[in-house]
Amino acid sequence: MIFQNTLEFAQQLDNQDELKEYKNEFIFPQHEGKNVIYFTGNSLGLQPKSARNYVDEVMNDWANLAVEGHFYADKPWWDYQERFANPLSKIVGAKPLEVTVMNTLTVNLHLLMVSFYRPTKKRYKIICEEKAFPSDQYMFQSQVNFHGYKPEDAIVEIKRREGEHNIRLEDILSKIEAVGDELALVLFGGVNYYTGQVFDMKTITEAGHKQGAKVGFDLAHAAGNIKLELHDWNVDFAAWCSYKYMNSGPGNASGCFVHEKHHSDSNLPRFAGWWGHNKERRFKMEPTFDPVHGADGWQISNLPILSLAPYLASVEMFAEVGIEKLIRKRNQITAYLEFILHEIDKEVKGHFEILTPTNQEERACQLSVFLHGEGRSLFDYLMKNGVVTDWREPNVIRLAPVPLYCSFEDMYNFGQILKKGILEN
């Protein structure tokens, strides 16, 4: 398709958009009586209008049933997480018994590393991406320290080549091969939070397994954003947060994936708690742990139902829409945003460059724009003019045109505001 930088063309794309009605299913912050242009679904998704009803349902059950709500609520609390199995499995490409909801993202990665990072004197190294999200970096360092190794030796970061913004797949694969039988774990982000680069998880998993290592992924910026096939890719484990593209609310519960090949491995260590115990015998208060078969067996504590309620509202919307439709629009609207940025660059050369790969297979719903010069003033200008973007040091504005609630007209209007902001700043 040949794009045009006109309001009429953007509105034409909106008229053809198969997801256009979903924009009305979300609540937008307001600027001068109008919806803001919201580009920060990669940080915190908007609130679905249905979320309040799901929360109110739990509040009413709590008020009217109190403790009996565990078994007699409309959606009984004791097995509330089971409602997530089917929709989440479709979002991440898994079998329903391979996914669960619990805790928050870094907590879950720590718990999964109990099972899948089992260093020995010979095999103890972790391979990760350079400039992973800081919480992952702290996790790696603390895990390595806990096991008695030195981070500068045990953590191997794959770096970008000089003058390049993204990590080459060939460099990842060659490093995995070079570390070889010293490699205990490969743990990458599915999508790099800073650049928006999508990693080839299937190929990375195959390479890690070839060296005898376990392979996992932090899917914070991938779940609900890209096509995932965790089961078929043979990924050992993964975790994600739900408050970005999955719109569950600030700091809300995480999700986990554990491949079914590990479910019956009695030698696999894990930290245990009563909510991971055999569901049929959970309330018999037995002294010996008998894990639930499947990813639910990694649960530890009773689940926060009030937090899960808006999460359930969101995943049920995802089930209604389907990941294929989301990806079709994501590709088109991200490409249109990229086109708008290039059109502006023709007029105001040298003010910015896009760090994110141009190849659609290597990016998702994010364009990271590096600003030359004093970028913070431009960011502030956008915010003051009703464009909510995300600032990341050094000098990057991240733009996430989330397909469920961003429109093509939003992209056009953003371009007009951005151009004016550059010229005025």
From Swiss-Prot:
Q: In which pathway does it act?
A: Amino-acid degradation; L-kynurenine degradation; L-alanine and anthranilate from L-kynurenine: step 1/1; Cofactor biosynthesis; NAD(+) biosynthesis; quinolinate from L-kynurenine: step 2/3
- N6-(pyridoxal phosphate)lysine carried by residues: 244
According to the UniProt record, one GO cellular component term is: cytoplasm
Query: What EC numbers are recorded for this enzyme?
Result: 3.7.1.3
Gene3D superfamilies to which the protein is assigned, alphabetical: Aspartate Aminotransferase, domain 1 (3.90.1150.10), Type I PLP-dependent aspartate aminotransferase-like (Major domain) (3.40.640.10)
* Cofactor (UniProt): pyridoxal 5'-phosphate
Query: Which GO BP terms sit in this record?
Result: anthranilate metabolic process; L-kynurenine catabolic process; L-tryptophan catabolic process to kynurenine; NAD biosynthetic process; quinolinate biosynthetic process
Reactions catalysed: L-kynurenine + H2O = anthranilate + L-alanine + H(+); 3-hydroxy-L-kynurenine + H2O = 3-hydroxyanthranilate + L-alanine + H(+)
Q: What is the top-level taxon of the source organism?
A: Bacteria
**Which residues are pyridoxal 5'-phosphate-binding?**
105-106, 133-136, 218, 221, 243, 274, 302
Keyword vocabulary terms for this entry: Hydrolase, Pyridine nucleotide biosynthesis, Pyridoxal phosphate
Q: Does the keyword NAD apply?
A: no
Q: Which GO terms describe its molecular function?
A: kynureninase activity; pyridoxal phosphate binding
Transmembrane parts of this sequence: none
Q: Does the keyword Hydrolase apply?
A: yes
Identify the InterPro entries for this entry. Aminotrans_V_dom, Kynureninase, PyrdxlP-dep_Trfase, PyrdxlP-dep_Trfase_major, PyrdxlP-dep_Trfase_small
Question: What quaternary structure, including any partners, is listed in this protein's UniProt entry?
Answer: Homodimer.
> What NCBIfam families has UniProt attached to this entry?
kynureninase
Briefly, what is this protein's role? Answer: Catalyzes the cleavage of L-kynurenine (L-Kyn) and L-3-hydroxykynurenine (L-3OHKyn) into anthranilic acid (AA) and 3-hydroxyanthranilic acid (3-OHAA), respectively.
UniProt record similarity statement = Belongs to the kynureninase family.
Q: Can you name this protein?
A: Kynureninase
Organism, as annotated: Flavobacterium psychrophilum (strain ATCC 49511 / DSM 21280 / CIP 103535 / JIP02/86)
Q: Which gene encodes it?
A: kynU
